[in-house]
């Protein structure tokens, strides 16, 4: 039996709501409904009664509940034990492509230079969208997440690492926003709220990407502009701030599970500055 089906069953039984269960599992509501139907088909019984917003366990669902809890608990314990034996020297760090390119790449180098304390530690640099990385963190498939947004779940611990400055850059001097095409570099969902006020409300990006390197290479060819970290852009060279634009300060957070067995290691690693310029 697919353990994901049992996991979904337990979440729906806990929340009594398909929408809230979907949100907790980082799935769509239709995916949750499909999983429940799959489980019901495998067992040959209905597990829930559905009357609008009133979702209840059937008698069969009530009988399945303790077995599902035991199976999932055993499975999680097995996964943790196996992972501990195979990954005791591995440490995975997740972030978006733009964060790796603009600041975390340098930090990773500093971690290797300071390996005296943790000799033999093997790092994995994982690139993905924030939502995917949060899910991996929740499922203990990721040790540490670096992101521009504070955690929204109580089970996570976090540390504010500092702030970095974004400015609107183009490839030629003395350019105005109205003369340029906008390239959207993704800096997190909450950044889009600020972005709307800093770029014209009717401005449609001709390119959207999560890679700062790609965006930087395209602005000259597309007569464009994009938001880049000031410290990174200065090192790159050949970039100029748009005349009628402003700057924006962004926070950077480290996030990990509160009950992580690598809590002490994480604290040690974060003593090494993540940002070149911390303020």
Curated annotation (Swiss-Prot):
Database matches in InterPro entries: LTTR, LysR_subst-bd, Tscrpt_reg_HTH_HdfR, Tscrpt_reg_HTH_LysR, WH-like_DNA-bd_sf, WH_DNA-bd_sf
PROSITE patterns: HTH_LYSR
Gene Ontology BP terms: negative regulation of DNA-templated transcription
SUPFAM superfamilies reported for this sequence: Periplasmic binding protein-like II, Winged helix' DNA-binding domain
Coiled coil: none
One annotated GO molecular function: DNA-binding transcription factor activity
Record keywords: DNA-binding, Repressor, Transcription, Transcription regulation
DNA-binding region: 18-37
Domain of life: Bacteria
All copies of domain HTH lysR-type, residue ranges: 1-58
Family to which this protein belongs: Belongs to the LysR transcriptional regulatory family.
Alphabetized NCBIfam families for the sequence: PRK03601.1
Function: Negatively regulates the transcription of the flagellar master operon flhDC by binding to the upstream region of the operon.
Protein name as annotated: HTH-type transcriptional regulator HdfR
């Amino acid at each position: 039996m697919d353990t994901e089906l049992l996991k979904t069953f337990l979440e729906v039984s806990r929340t009594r709501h398909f929408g809230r269960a979907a949100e907790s599992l980082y799935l769509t509501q239709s995916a949750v409904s499909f999983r429940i139907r799959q489980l019901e088909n495998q067992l040959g019984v209905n597990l829930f009664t559905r009357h609008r917003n009133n979702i209840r366990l059937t008698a069969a669902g009530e009988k399945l509940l303790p077995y599902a809890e035991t199976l999932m608990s055993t499975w999680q314990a097995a996964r943790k034990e196996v992972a501990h034996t195979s990954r005791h020297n591995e440490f995975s760090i997740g972030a978006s492509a733009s964060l790796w390119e603009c600041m975390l790449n340098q930090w990773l180098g500093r971690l290797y230079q300071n390996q005296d304390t943790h000799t033999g530690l093997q790092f994995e640099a994982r690139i993905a969208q924030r939502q995917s990385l949060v899910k991996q963190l929740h499922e203990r498939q990721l040790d540490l997440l670096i992101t521009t947004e504070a955690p929204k779940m109580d089970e996570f611990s976090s540390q504010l690492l500092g702030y970095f400055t974004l400015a609107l850059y183009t490839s030629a001097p003395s350019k105005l926003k109205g003369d340029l095409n906008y390239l959207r570099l993704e800096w997190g969902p909450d950044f889009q709220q600020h972005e709307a006020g800093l770029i014209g409300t009717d401005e449609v990006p001709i390119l959207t990407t999560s890679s700062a390197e790609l965006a930087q290479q395209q602005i000259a060819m597309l007569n464009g502009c994009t938001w880049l970290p000031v410290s990174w852009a200065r090192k790159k060279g050949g970039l100029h701030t748009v005349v009628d634009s402003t700057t924006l300060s962004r926070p950077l957070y480290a996030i990990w599970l509160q009950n992580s067995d690598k809590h002490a290691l994480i604290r040690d690693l974060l003593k090494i500055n993540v940002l070149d310029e911390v303020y």
